[in-house]
């Protein structure tokens, strides 16, 4: 897979093409992918709260320093990325004088407004966002592996689900949620679900993105909708 240093080199080449001296990235998925780091600050997403400011020869990750592990610090240092407190980002950005590349769709409106009139702003899609649209062989292989592992977990779940119903057990939507998590968590490299389980029966099955709670969980049969 591509190293963080190699990814930064591609971003800097794109910055040069656009005439940008600096590039601010606030979208968490872009930052995680560029740095090859993962976190759990947002439910169901392997991202962490941060800003990334990239220059022609330097880069700074604004993040809660206490959250970084020793291997993460070493990886950042190897890629030439320094670390600064998350709250320091606004001050450092305000001190910029050269052109700054930002994606207006992926930066806070307040940040964009504060830059107007203080620094030449180049508005364009984050280069890293475009890079993500082209999957590497490793990306494709890992996606296939994840789908296979999830398929195995689902096969185990459906077999257990049907066997329990055949024995006359009464299963609620909440039971199904717990069963799915149990089988998925047994697969290699499991981290977390990608979204909350949607297990709905009767009227609940008609609710988009329904999430069962203890007091709403209905008894289910083979007609239960599961996502």
Language-model-detected regions and their locations in the chain:
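Terminal domain-start leader segments
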Residues: 1-173, 178, 185-192
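Single conserved hydrophobic/aromatic residue that forms the stacking wall/gate
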Residues: 215-227
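Internal maturation/activation junctions in enzymes
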Residues: 194-196
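Flexible, glycine/threonine-enriched loop-and-boundary segments that flank and lead into catalytic domains
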Residues: 181, 198-214
């Amino acid at each position: 897979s591509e190293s963080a240093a190699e990814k930064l080199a591609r971003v800097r080449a794109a910055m040069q093409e656009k005439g940008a001296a600096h590039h601010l990235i606030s979208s968490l998925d872009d930052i995680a992918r560029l740095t090859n780091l993962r976190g759990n600050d947002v439910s169901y997403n392997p991202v962490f709260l941060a800003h990334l400011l990239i220059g022609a020869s330097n880069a700074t990750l604004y993040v809660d320093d206490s959250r970084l592990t020793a291997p993460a610090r070493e990886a950042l240092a190897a890629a030439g990325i320094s670390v600064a407190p998350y709250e320091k980002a606004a001050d450092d950005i305000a001190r910029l004088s050269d052109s700054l590349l930002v994606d207006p769709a992926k930066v806070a409106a307040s940040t964009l407004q504060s830059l107007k009139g203080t620094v030449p702003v180049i508005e364009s899609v984050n280069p890293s966002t475009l890079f993500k649209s082209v999957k590497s062989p490793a990306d494709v292989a890992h996606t296939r592996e994840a789908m296979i592992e999830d398929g195995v977990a689902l096969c185990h779940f459906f077999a257990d689900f049907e066997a329990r119903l055949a024995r006359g057990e009464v299963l609620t939507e909440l039971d199904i949620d717990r069963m799915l998590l149990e089988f998925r968590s047994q697969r290699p490299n499991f981290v977390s679900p990608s979204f909350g389980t949607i297990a709905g029966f009767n009227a609940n099955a008609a609710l988009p993105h329904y999430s069962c709670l203890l007091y709403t969980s209905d008894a289910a049969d083979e007609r239960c909708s599961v996502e």
